[in-house]
Amino acid sequence: MFDLNITHEVNELLKQVRKGLRNKGYKESKSRTNRYIGTIHLNYITEYFIKGNLVFEIERDLSNSTITTRLHYNGKEHKEIRLADILSLA
């Protein structure tokens, strides 16, 4: 895909999480943010997996190769979670 600087192991885990969530009936939505604030370049890809009141958010910052995962419940951010824990919580 377009995960240029993220390690192979993390990419494989992302693929497993995406596939697992789709298999559990979650719908996928993506957004991309690419903008400059002063001299800072922001380049994010955010994926949402939605089922009922639960939303798993996977935000990838392509500028510095970080991944943030969050669980939302009833429209509010519940907590940040580890990528490896998503399937056990879904």
Mark where each language-model region is:
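Terminal, regulation- and interaction-focused segments at domain boundaries
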Residues: 1-24
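Short, flexible coil/linker segments at or flanking structured domains
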Residues: 14-16, 37, 46, 74
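Intrinsic disorder/low-complexity segments enriched in polar/small residues
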Residues: 16, 25, 29, 78-81
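Short aromatic-centered micro-motifs
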Residues: 21, 48-49, 71
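Amphipathic, interaction-prone secondary-structure segments
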Residues: 28-66
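Intrinsically disordered, low-complexity regulatory segments enriched in Ser/Thr/Pro
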Residues: 52-89
